[in-house]
Amino acid sequence: MVKMRVIAGTYRSRQLAAPRGLQTRPTSDRLRETLFNILAPRTVGCHFVDLYAGTGAVGIEAISRGAEHVWFAENAEPALASLRQNLATLKISRGFTLEDRGVGAMLQRLSKLTQPIDVVYLDPPYEAEDEYSGTLNFFGSVRGRAILSADALVIAEHSSKAKLAERYGVLEHTRLLKQGDAALSFFVPAAAEKTRPPDGDQ
């Protein structure tokens, strides 16, 4: 098992397990630290979605730093086993929802929520272009936008060699952060006034 750690918060320095092999590519400790340094002002009390969660390291970091609730979506073994092991090892028994049927099933569940989502993190296999476009287009759609809070962030981890689109529906690309082989693309819902022409325009 590959060992990682929680960076900060309630579970700071606690070890996390990840399976060996090429099928699972956990978000590195360094990239996770950078991500949460950026998210710091909004993590406490937030509602956080960790899609393609793998070992759960990102969502667990959010819990450790005070997120109100985290939704994990992962259906691939042995990553799912590691995710469950990590939650059990840290004795995290509430404040999360685990969807083990995958991202599609999780998006269906999220569509029924009355509580808006503040942060969405997605980390599909880097080569899975359809997973990136499908998930980002969902959150950029009318249905997906409806479950996001007004100032929500949607963040995609991807290869630093890849370039995601500047826009997916109402989601606008606002920031690109590269770190080694990995990159983070940040998206926000376009302001309402930007999604329609001013009165009088044809």
Segments predicted by a language model, with ranges:
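Class I S-adenosyl-L-methionine-dependent methyltransferase catalytic core
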Residues: 1-202
